[in-house]
Amino acid sequence: MYAYLKGIITKITAKYIVLETNGIGYILHVANPYAYSGQVNQEDQIYVHQVVREDAHLLYGFRSEDEKKLFLSLISVSGIGPVSALAIIAADDNAGLVQAIETKNITYLTKFPKIGKKTAQQMVLDLEGKVVVAGDDLPAKVAVQASAENQELEEAMEAMLALGYKATELKKIKKFFEGTTDTAENYIKSALKMLVK
């Protein structure tokens, strides 16, 4: 079991980042890979959780210990696997998540990909009173400006598909952002907030 890895981020894709430490490149599946865009070729410390399956050994990465604890709480719920837990964390509304669990807001919880009514009810049953989230330390939404071609938006939509959101949902979101320019990270944050509301 690993607590964290410290190394240099060498690659970012829609589903994972690669962290090189001591000459070994580790694939870390993270909630929002593009959140690490500003740290490529820089040293970073990423908290990790290893999942061992019959066909794979996977590492999941987190920006903080609190995010890792939230992930571990989520995967402890029957019906929520690591991919679904990352999608929930990627929504970047941890306070809203805790409030939905505490107030038994099933409608809010079912807006996450692959979370149906029964799983949402199980989340409330298993996590009510047990999930505490420290303050939301991520930056506020950045104003977007017009642009003709938008590679960042394409990368954001690809990452959203990787999180399990449907292409039909993402088409509507993409139209909303067309003609704007921003980072893939901010597009993802904004899109997730729109989808969760």
UniProtKB/Swiss-Prot annotation:
Keywords assigned: Cytoplasm, DNA damage, DNA recombination, DNA repair, DNA-binding
CC terms in the record's Gene Ontology section: cytoplasm; Holliday junction helicase complex; Holliday junction resolvase complex
Chain spans, region Flexible linker: 143-147
SUPFAM superfamilies listed in its UniProt record: DNA helicase RuvA subunit, C-terminal domain, Nucleic acid-binding proteins, RuvA domain 2-like
Domain of life: Bacteria
Segments of this protein annotated with the region Domain III: 148-197
Pfam family, one: HHH_5
Region (Domain II): 64-142
Domain notes: Has three domains with a flexible linker between the domains II and III and assumes an 'L' shape. Domain III is highly mobile and contacts RuvB.
Family the UniProt entry places it in: Belongs to the RuvA family.
The protein's name in its UniProt record: Holliday junction branch migration complex subunit RuvA
Naturally occurring in which organism (per UniProt): Streptococcus pneumoniae serotype 19F (strain G54)
Source taxonomy: Bacteria, Bacillati, Bacillota, Bacilli, Lactobacillales
